[in-house]
Structures are given as C-alpha cells and as structure tokens.
Amino acid sequence: MDLITLGKAAKDAAFQLATASTAQKNKALAIIADELEANAADILAANSKDIELGRQAGLSEAMLDRLLLNESRLNGIANDVRNVISLTDPVGSEIDSKVLENGMQLSRRRVPLGVVGVIYEARPNVTIDIAALCLKTGNASILRGGKETFFSNMELVKVIQSALAKAGLPAASVQYIEKPDRELVTQLLKLDDYVDMIIPRGGAGLHKMCKENSTIPVIIGGFGISHIFVDETADLAKSVDVVENAKAQRPSACNALDTLLVHERIAEQFLPMLVAKLNGKVTFVVEPKAKAYMTKAEQVRDASEGDFDTEWLSYTLGVKVVADVQEAIDHMREHNASHSDAIMTNHLQNAELFINSAGSAAVYVNASTRFTDGAQFGLGAEVAVSTQKLHARGPMGLEELTSYKWVGKANYLSRA
C-alpha cells in the first residue's frame, strides 16, 4: 500500500471538503446513516468473522464484547451519525471581529484542519464516529483501525465511500489503511506533507509510540490518573455516593477514578463508610494510614511503588490519607493528574485552590470524574479526550477539529 498516494488523495479531497456547504456535508452523513442500516446484513457478517477470529486468538469476553456489532448497536451508530447532522457546523463561523484604526475589518474565521490521521484500537464504531465528525468539519481522514476489527472496518468504509460518491463528495475524503503492518503506522506518522494532525485512540503505549515517532502534531490524551479528594468539610454520605459512581459505574473508562485522597480529619469516619459501600466490588490498594481505618475491607493490599501511578481501568482503587488540600494537590502533581480530578468540599476557598492548582484537563467540585465526555458536556460527540495543553484540551468536539484563519477586509488599503 502506497501511503503517499493515499496522502495526496486525502489532501486533494480536503481542499474540496473545505468549500463544501453544510447541506452537502449533511446529505453525505444522512446517506451514511441510511446505508449503515440498509447494509446491516453485510456489516454484521463481516463483524462475525472478526468475532470468530478473536475467539480463536484467545481474546477475552470483555474485549469480544467491545468488538461486537449487532442490529441494535448498528442502529445506535446510525442514529449517532444523524445526531452529528443536527449539530451546528463550526466551519465558516466568526470567532471574533473588530475594526482597526486604519479601517480594516479584521476577523477570525473557523476553517477545517485539513487531513486528520486517526490510529485506533478495537471498537468498530470508532470508524464511523471519526469519519462523521471529520466530514461535518470539512476534514479528510485517514483511518487505521486494529487488526481485531479488520473485516468490520473494511465493510464500514465501503459504506462510507459509497455514500460520499452519492452525495457528490470525493470518496478519498475517508480512506482506510487496509494492511495491519505496523510499519505502515510509522509511515503514516511521517506523512507531514499531507497529514495535518494525528489522533491516537488507545492505551498509553500507542500514545507514546505516536509521540516519539511522529513528525506531525499529535493529540495526546485518553489516559491519566484520575483523583478525588474528600475534604474535611465535605458531606460524607454524598461523597461516598460520588466515589462509588466514579469508580464502579464503568471502571474501564479513561475518566474512572483511580486514586482516592482523604483528609486526615475525616478519614476515621469516611473510610469505613466507603468500605461498607464498595466491599465485594472493589480491591483497595492502600497506604498505612488509610489501612488503619479499613480493617473490614474484604479485598485489600498494601500499596507498592508505582501503584499511585497506575491507571487501573478495573475494580481497583488506590486510597491515601493526606493532611490537607495542598498535600492532595501535591500528590496529584507527582502522579500524572492530567485527565479528570475532583474535590468534595463545602469550603469555597479550598474549592478555588483546587480548581486553580489542579493540572488536569477537567476539574470538578462536588461531581464525579465520569462527566468528562463529549456528550455529557453538551458537545454532541467527541473525537478524543485531549490531556495536553496545545490546540485542544478535554473532550474534542466539532470546534476542536477546526483551526482558524485571519480575514482582513478593506477598501484597497495599503500599509503606511
């Protein structure tokens, strides 16, 4: 597979997409949604091949469930595409404008990024999600999914490209790297003449590989240690409920709670309440001060080096007692708090200190870390959750898939 040819085609398509009307882009999305449902039999047959190969390869039931498509899930994906149609198209909108002293009207106008390369693992719905969001924002995309969903992704991309042709848009607006050869990923990361941004969606290893090998700007995110600090002024009963939600609602999510920090003045009262709530569900990984108050915990072990740097993605929770909000903040800084962190408190000054000091992409006061999500934020959809500070931060919706250009309008004006 010649990635340079792929890149050139994507760049040409991006120039056409940049001038496509919202109506034309929405037409393509509507056709994609309809064609997903119309071609359900072929898509599900392809997915069955992936599932069977996954079983033969010894994939876990949890992983197989992530790969699985059925009629209900496929209808849900089609409806997600229809939801993207209903979202406001940011392309062409003015961010701000002003009239300069020389009479020039100067504005910043949103424009597509160009070509977005996305490297992702497992779930086939990501193929449609990314393609839909990129199309809505006038971006061409080059997709590289995991080998576990090869047949599913090939069928999905066929549907997308057919829909693009029917809508009068270039089929190369969405392209897929068919071969699972890892060397092609490395080549994609060097395709800076044609690709404007790389978005990895997967574990820390994938992000690290992209960051170290790419000559293209990379969006880093999707992982980081999530913390909750329970302050001495917090409502303890309500805090236990929030901690349970953050840890146990969906422990495999990147915004699930990893480490609980508890003020020493309420630890003796709060930690037994926590144990009573989560016993049998959660394994507690504890430092000595916390352990002293958790004698009734059924599943508990002493924390060892590296435990507080671990994104558990499971029913495991690190627990530590701290002296105050400042020690909690210091702990978070030391242990990669870059994704989602929260404080439970009724103390306004401590809340503001936490908000201003926490280095995470999303910070909450008296709310679960589980809210860091494009749909929950009212963005409608997300392409990734960025934990870096440049270009975009937190859930990346449609606006985050755009850049801007300066537009100056005048009456044959020359610079003095």
From Swiss-Prot:
PROSITE patterns: PROA. It catalyses: L-glutamate 5-semialdehyde + phosphate + NADP(+) = L-glutamyl 5-phosphate + NADPH + H(+). Its EC number is 1.2.1.41. The keyword Repressor does not apply. Catalyzes the NADPH-dependent reduction of L-glutamate 5-phosphate into L-glutamate 5-semialdehyde and phosphate. The product spontaneously undergoes cyclization to form 1-pyrroline-5-carboxylate. GO terms for biological process: L-proline biosynthetic process. It is an enzyme of class 1 (oxidoreductase). This is Gamma-glutamyl phosphate reductase. Belongs to the gamma-glutamyl phosphate reductase family. GO terms for molecular function: glutamate-5-semialdehyde dehydrogenase activity; NADP binding. It holds the Pfam family Aldedh. It is found in: Cytoplasm. Keywords: Amino-acid biosynthesis, Cytoplasm, NADP, Oxidoreductase, Proline biosynthesis. InterPro entries: Ald_DH/histidinol_DH (IPR016161), Ald_DH_C (IPR016163), Ald_DH_N (IPR016162), Aldehyde_DH_dom (IPR015590), G-glutamylP_reductase_CS (IPR020593), Glu-5-SA_DH (IPR012134), GPR_dom (IPR000965). GO terms for cellular component: cytoplasm. PANTHER family: DELTA-1-PYRROLINE-5-CARBOXYLATE SYNTHASE, GLUTAMATE SEMIALDEHYDE DEHYDROGENASE. It comes from Vibrio vulnificus (strain YJ016). Pathway: Amino-acid biosynthesis; L-proline biosynthesis; L-glutamate 5-semialdehyde from L-glutamate: step 2/2.
